[in-house]
Design a protein with these regions (language model features):
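Carbohydrate-binding surface patches
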Residues: 24, 522-557
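Active-site-proximal helices and loops of the catalytic beta/alpha 8
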Residues: 235-243, 253, 258-269, 328, ...
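Substrate-binding/active-site clefts of carbohydrate-active enzymes
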Residues: 146-197, 204-324, 328-329, 351-357, ...
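Aromatic/acidic polysaccharide-binding cleft in carbohydrate-active enzymes
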Residues: 148, 160, 377-383, 424-446, ...
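Non-catalytic, glycine-rich low-complexity segments
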Residues: 1-33, 110-128, 133-135
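Hydrophobic faces of well-ordered beta-strands that scaffold small-molecule active sites
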Residues: 141-143, 199-201, 245-247, 335, ...
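C-terminal beta-strand-rich structural cap/linker in extracellular carbohydrate-active enzymes
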Residues: 29-31, 566-580
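Aromatic- and glycine-rich beta-strand/loop motifs that create alpha-glucan
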Residues: 32-81, 91-105
């Protein structure tokens, strides 16, 4: 038995509360394992005396996920008294081994006279410890908007801007196009018709950049975008249409005109706000240049985005009060935390406690590009931007030698990182303002459509970057931040793309199993790059086929969504979604 491949700890994804009554236990094994039993019971089932002989009840575990080198076995328990003690019985072709908290034992060695068995325990299921992201997020279809580039809805005076909204050549990071909040309000019917139920806005606060990630004043809407009244109208109008609103917030760093930084610039280390930032040198050096010299910290090495000390209780209190105002006065439904893995855990815990007290259903999203387990324990973020999902999709289509098993391994790894309830609200996306446009990255319309189909048929809270529904193209920033081509949209130039996206969104809404956790994978030895998976439901199962080959494949089916499927033939690079 390959003992090195076996792993379990009684925490996070290995052992957690699914809800107020259920506990999920997972164990990772090698592929030589043929079965696993959980031996479990209440820790006090036989009394509390030190001389009792505790015996666990056997319960077969289910092989839930296959990874490249491992199996993940799982079981769901509903312990009567909300606590459980346990160990594992593992079977291979020729061995039976027991796993306790202190290691592996044979049946004989485990029962040696005088041995003190170290069992795993879930001590008690406390209601307040359950990871419980807002349930509504799992049913939400998000749409990400860069306000300056989405729609220009008013003619009030604004800083320099392109004369022609349709100008998309030679865009720089310093261009302004005049998009605003009123433009977003005007296009809410368009978003509702598309099937969108949540909008995520890039920062809207006072700043001198088009992206607003160097915030000058967290209390003022940038006048280029409109007024506080415009934002309130946007939120209220969106809510009337069944659309939630999430704001982007930057707490890792501020802009140079932020009042606290300006006070430091004027007074140096005598400023009462000196400890609001991560400054390493005294006396304070008043210069703007790369931060590679280490005089103070900032975002990357940018001197116009000085890093806030989010471990400072005064900083926590200030921004807690700011966000409290946003939630109470504006009625927003979520906050996205920029550079979310560089903000202190204590800051996030403070924000979670403060804001969830006001609105327990507030959605807190972190921008993190990596395994985010340490931020998703229930007292910080509800979800993160799921870059591992995005990257795994890209890597499969880049590697033409990868087969359907490799795709399964990649997706199963993504969904093994976090608890089930977190997987349901992971912020899945194909592109953002920080990446190439999806179509440009994919390099072909077929691959782009395949990835859209995956986005809308796997667990998570999918997000469409503005323009992805019309197959907008663009390289890395700033090319991925072009204006929305409303003239061409209204002329019907992108109807085919819009119809494709709308149909997938409608499908996701119609079939709840597409939002559930369970995925069953299938593989075809004759067509190794034919991706196929089931999404089982209570009444029926939905099956997804993605033909990533250059040949036609006969598949008789009851289709509910197709692309390049005719007369029971799934053509090369086609998509088939059907009931089985």
């Amino acid at each position: 038995m390959n003992l090195h491949a076996i792993a379990h700890r009684s925490l996070f994804t290995d052992c957690y509360a699914r809800n107020e009554r259920e506990i999920i236990l997972n164990i990772r094994t090698g592929k030589d394992i043929t079965g696993v039993n959980l031996l479990f019971d209440d820790p006090y089932a036989y009394g509390i005396s030190g001389d009792i002989h505790w015996i666990g009840r056997p319960l077969p575990m289910r092989m839930e996920r296959e990874l490249k080198h491992n199996y993940v076995y799982t079981v769901k328990l509903t312990p009567e008294y909300r606590r459980v003690q346990y160990c594992f019985e593992l079977f291979s072709a020729d061995e039976v081994i027991y796993l306790y908290e202190d290691g592996f034992y044979t049946a004989e060695s485990a029962e040696k006279k005088g041995r003190l068995k170290q069992y795993f325990k879930f001590p008690y299921l406390n209601k307040c410890d359950v990871i419980a992201p807002p349930a509504w997020a799992a049913d939400t279809i998000w749409y990400q908007i860069m306000p300056d580039r989405f729609c220009k809805g008013s003619d009030h005076p604004k800083r320099m801007q392109h004369k022609d909204w349709e100008d998309r050549e030679g865009i720089t990071g310093f261009d302004f196009f005049g998009g605003d909040l009123r433009g977003i309000i005007q296009k809410l019917p368009y978003l509702k018709d598309l099937g969108i139920t949540g909008i995520y806005l890039l920062p809207v606060f006072l700043s001198d950049t088009n992206h607003k990630y160097n915030t000058f004043d967290y209390t003022k809407i940038d006048p280029d975008f409109g007024t506080e009244e415009d934002l309130i109208e946007l939120v209220n109008t969106a809510h009337d249409m069944g659309i939630r609103v999430m704001l982007d917030a930057v707490f890792n760093h501020s802009g140079t005109e932020f009042f606290a930084w300006q006070d430091i610039w004027e007074k140096g280390e005598d400023s009462e706000f000196f400890d609001w930032f991560v400054i390493h040198r005294k006396p304070f050096e008043r210069k703007y240049a790369s931060l590679r010299d280490g005089r103070f910290d900032g975002f990357a090495f940018l001197d116009n985005m000085p890093k806030l000390d989010t471990g400072n209780p005064k900083v926590q209190k200030y921004f807690g009060d700011i966000c409290t105002y946003w939630v109470q006065k504006w009625g927003i439904d979520g906050i996205r935390f920029d550079v979310g893995n560089e903000v202190s855990h204590r800051f996030l815990q403070y924000m979670n406690r403060t804001l969830k007290t006001i609105n327990p259903e507030l959605f807190l999203l972190g921008e993190i590009w990596m395994d985010s387990a340490q931020w998703l324990r229930g007292d910080e973020y509800d979800s993160v931007m799921n870059y591992p999902f995005f990257e795994s999709l890209q890597n499969f289509w880049v590697d033409e030698d990868a087969d359907s098993r490799d795709f399964m391994y990649a997706m199963n790894r993504v969904y093994s990182l976090y608890p089930e309830q977190t997987n349901a609200v992971l912020f899945n996306h194909l592109d953002t303002h920080d990446t190439m446009r999806a179509l440009t990255r994919c390099g072909s319309l077929d691959i782009f459509y395949h990835q859209q189909a995956v986005l809308m048929t796997l667990p998570g809270s999918p997000c469409i970057y503005y323009g992805t529904e019309i197959a907008m193209e663009g390289g890395h920033d700033p090319d991925c931040r072009k204006t929305m081509p409303w003239r061409d949209i209204e002329a019907g130039k992108f109807t085919d793309h819009q119809t494709f996206t709308k149909a997938l969104i409608a499908l996701r809404k119609q079939y709840p199993q597409l939002r559930d956790e369970k995925i069953v994978w299938h593989h075809d030895a004759m067509n190794p790059r034919l991706v196929c998976y089931d999404r089982p439901g209570e009444q029926e199962t939905i099956r997804v086929y993605l033909n990533n080959t250059e040949k036609d494949i006969p598949i008789p089916a009851d289709p509910i969504f197709t692309y390049k499927y005719e007369n029971a033939i799934l053509k090369a690079n086609g998509i088939l979604i059907c009931r089985i």
